[in-house]
């Protein structure tokens, strides 16, 4: 495989017929013989009652996943940051994206392969967005990417009133695919459903309004809901999940102007914090290059690799490009969650087996971890409510990283609650 390339394959599990293939970083398509070999080894293992999930070669990692004994997804990646965790999350996201757009019934009960292939084309833009580097982390964390905007109380009140007038309880205001404010019922959807809805809206071509049928993978995988979206200003959309009523025209002509025109300036201000994810007034240590903050209760996150955008605009010799920062922070998150901060279910059991052998011998788990390289330092901290991952300049003293992390947590719990 070419360096930094990814291939995603979707096949009908029973027949092995390819339904689609998507790729990143390569102009070549996989040959039928390669596709057949990848699917064949998985089917052979399954027939021997062996669950084949992943393998790796010198420069490539492969992962398999079967869903409902109907759809098989295979991903091959030669990216340096590819891991078992990231590839499994990718396969989960891809299947749930398919459910979101065409529903579970057509995927579980495949009656016409050619028609299914045609229907799945509607998923391509959303699926492709999971293969690309973005300014979001929800695909990996399974949390909702958010921004802390100015005038949040005003926007929240406006959204609540607008959603109620649209005969719904599920409403959301997003900037660049990140949630600014949402109604209480919107937050009751699963975090993966909210993440998928945000990524769907961000992946679609800009439009003043849309009436889009969606299936909620966990809440309503077989019965569609209507997703109404309206572009308030370029880059800022308001979304409503509803039933047969009201009509798109009624909401667009009667409600949008009534509720959102008076708050035009606060809406535009959302764009100023979109890249950093929070206002410039949030105090951050000058050594921080990027951060990922996760609220464990709400399953929402703040993410940026432009912690000091105004300062960096004046520099032309950045030691780490934004793409390198994203890759470093994603890799550190994967390392920490796989080895030191395993996710926990409500019953207290780990959802991810720890890859570090010493974990199984102790009753406690790590609450802090760090890595050091020639180009950057990374620090992770786990508290009762939050997970924090920092990307720091290499010249930041190692002994000061804990203090920097504590001050960062304090800033987002006291001055700017998240």
Swiss-Prot record:
Knockdown of fy disrupted Hedgehog signaling and caused defects in neural tube closure, including exencephaly, spina bifida, and holoprosencephaly-like features. It comes from the Eukaryota. This is Protein fuzzy homolog. Pfam families: Fuz_longin_1, Fuz_longin_2, Fuz_longin_3. Interacts with rsg1. Interacts with intu and wdpcp; fuz, intu and wdpcp probably form the core CPLANE (ciliogenesis and planar polarity effectors) complex. Disulfide bonds: none annotated. Probable planar cell polarity effector involved in cilium biogenesis. Proposed to function as core component of the CPLANE (ciliogenesis and planar polarity effectors) complex involved in the recruitment of peripheral IFT-A proteins to basal bodies. May regulate protein and membrane transport to the cilium. May control the organization of the apical actin cytoskeleton, which is essential for the normal orientation of elongating ciliary microtubules. Its main location: cytoplasm.
């Amino acid at each position: 495989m070419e360096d930094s390339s990814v291939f995603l394959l979707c096949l009908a599990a029973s027949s092995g017929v390819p339904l689609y293939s998507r790729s990143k970083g390569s102009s070549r398509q996989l040959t039928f013989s390669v596709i057949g070999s990848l699917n064949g080894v998985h089917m052979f293992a399954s027939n021997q009652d062996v669950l084949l999930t992943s393998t790796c070669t010198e420069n490539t990692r492969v992962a398999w996943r079967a869903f409902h004994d109907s759809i098989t997804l295979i991903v091959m990646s030669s990216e340096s940051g590819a891991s078992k965790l990231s590839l499994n999350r990718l396969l989960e996201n891809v299947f749930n994206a398919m459910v979101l757009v065409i529903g579970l019934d057509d995927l579980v009960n495949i009656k016409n392969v050619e028609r299914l292939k045609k229907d799945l084309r509607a998923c391509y833009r959303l699926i492709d967005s999971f293969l690309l580097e973005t300014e979001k982390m929800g695909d990996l964390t399974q949390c909702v990417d958010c921004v802390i905007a100015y005038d949040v109380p005003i926007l929240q009140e406006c959204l609540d009133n607008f959603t109620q007038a649209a005969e719904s309880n599920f409403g959301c205001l997003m900037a660049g695919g990140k949630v600014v404010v949402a109604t209480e019922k919107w937050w009751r959807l699963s975090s993966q459903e909210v993440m998928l809805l945000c990524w769907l809206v961000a992946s679609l071509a800009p439009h003043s309004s849309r009436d889009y049928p969606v299936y909620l993978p966990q809440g309503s995988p077989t019965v569609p809901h209507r997703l109404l979206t309206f572009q308030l200003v370029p880059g800022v959309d308001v979304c409503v999940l509803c039933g047969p009523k009201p009509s798109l025209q009624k909401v667009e002509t009667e409600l949008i102007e009534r509720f959102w025109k008076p708050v035009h300036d606060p809406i535009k201000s959302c764009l100023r914090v979109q890249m950093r994810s929070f206002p410039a007034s949030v105090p951050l240590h000058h050594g921080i290059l990027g951060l990922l903050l996760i609220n464990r209760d709400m399953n929402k996150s703040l993410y940026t690799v432009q912690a000091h955008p105004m300062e960096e605009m004046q520099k032309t010799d950045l030691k780490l490009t934004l793409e390198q920062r994203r890759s470093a922070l994603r890799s550190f998150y994967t390392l920490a969650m796989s080895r030191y901060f395993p996710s926990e279910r409500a019953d207290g059991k780990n959802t991810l087996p720890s890859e570090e052998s010493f974990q199984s011998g102790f009753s406690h788990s790590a609450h802090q971890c760090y890595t050091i390289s020639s180009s950057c330092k990374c620090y992770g901290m786990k508290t009762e409510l939050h997970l924090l991952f920092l990307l720091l300049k290499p010249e930041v003293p190692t002994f000061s990283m804990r203090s920097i992390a504590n001050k960062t947590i304090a800033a987002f719990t006291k001055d700017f609650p998240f």
